[in-house]
Each structure stands twice: as C-alpha cells, then as structure tokens.
C-alpha cells in the first residue's frame, strides 16, 4: 500500500499489508501500530531487494502524491500483473482538459467507489471515522448491512471465509454472502457528508 495516513493504518490492522511512504512521520505512526512498513520510494532498487512482492497480490495506491501515483501504479502492474494496482479517483480539477489523465490510467482509479478521492478519504477519517469489521450471517445479510450503514460508511473490502480479500471498486459488483466479513470506514453519525481537505493542507513530504 502506497501512502500512510490514519485510514490506511486502520485498514492494516484488519488485513495483512505493508505500507510504503516517503514521509517519515507517517511511517513512524504505522510502526507504532506494529504494521510492516517500507520507508522510501517503493519503486527503488533497494525496495526491490528488500520487499518480497510474492506476499502481496494487490497494491493500493492511497496517497496524495499525484505525480508519483501513476508511476507507482504502472510499476507494480508490470511486476504483479494487469489489474494488480488500484488507485483512488482524481479530483475535479484534474478532470479539466489540461489535466486529463490517460484513459488507461483512469481505468485503474476505481478503488472503493468511483468518486472516492484521497482528500475525501482523509476528510472522512478526520471526522471520527473508524474501521469496523462486520461478519454477515443468515440473519444479517449484506442487504441488511447496507440499510444499517450505507449513509455513514465507505465499504473497503470483503474477506471470504477462506481468507481471500476482495477490494470494493467501482468496476466490480461484489455480492458478499453469509460468513463473509465486511471492512468499512464508519462514522458514528447516521449520515455524514464528506469533509474535503484543501490539497495544500495535506502537506505531504516528497
């Protein structure tokens, strides 16, 4: 996973991951939570020698580093295979003609849902969002789950009984079944509007 912030650290507490970032403060927070990390450029030769990619099937590009994200995406798709690197949507300003991303790259920006940007995700966690794992059952189906949490959650991934992790994206229609676990970012409020940070306030280290 490229990008360490409160939300990614919470995801890592539920799913086996390694977080990579060039921001030492973010890496330090992840290490305090005993999450495996890589401090530095994940595309570097050093990363290639020290990180065993065979342990990971998917790379999630969850970072504000807009110039680095496409490079990371294509690098790991080359290493792991087509569709193995997923990123967040771009913001409205990037959709102008002068900032238009390529159709090929845009097709990979589908993580969680079609309009989930880094700023929205970070804003959601700043409003008290917490990671919650819910096990489905015959008595509490995914339809029941959506009714209960839809207005105050972002569904992140589902874990099958055999341990397989399936990420929610705008391109795949996952139909979770009984005994699956759903991992979501949920707020206490019954309905939560996104807080959107100004990109300058995120102040990532590059």
Each model region followed by its residue ranges:
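Cytosolic regulatory regions of ion transport systems
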Residues: 1-206
């Amino acid at each position: 996973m490229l990008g360490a912030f409160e939300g990614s650290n919470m995801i890592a507490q539920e799913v086996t991951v390694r977080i990579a970032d060039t921001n030492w403060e973010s890496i330090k927070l992840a290490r305090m939570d005993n999450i495996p990390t890589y401090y530095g450029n994940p595309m570097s030769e050093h990363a290639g020698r020290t990180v065993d990619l065979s342990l990971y099937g998917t790379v999630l590009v969850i970072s504000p580093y807009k110039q680095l994200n496409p490079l990371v995406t294509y690098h790991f798709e080359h290493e792991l295979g087509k569709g193995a690197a997923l990123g967040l949507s771009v913001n409205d300003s990037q959709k102008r003609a002068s900032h238009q991303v390529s159709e090929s790259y845009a097709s990979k920006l589908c993580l969680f849902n079609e309009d989930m940007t880094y700023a929205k995700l970070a804003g959601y966690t700043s409003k008290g969002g917490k990671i919650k794992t819910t096990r489905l059952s015959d008595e509490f189906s995914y339809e029941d789950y959506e009714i209960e949490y839809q207005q105050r959650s972002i569904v992140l991934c589902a874990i099958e009984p055999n341990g397989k992790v399936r990420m929610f994206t705008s391109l795949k229609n996952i139909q979770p079944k009984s005994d699956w676990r759903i991992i979501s970012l949920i707020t206490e409020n019954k309905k939560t509007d996104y807080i959107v940070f100004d990109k300058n306030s995120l102040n990532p280290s590059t």
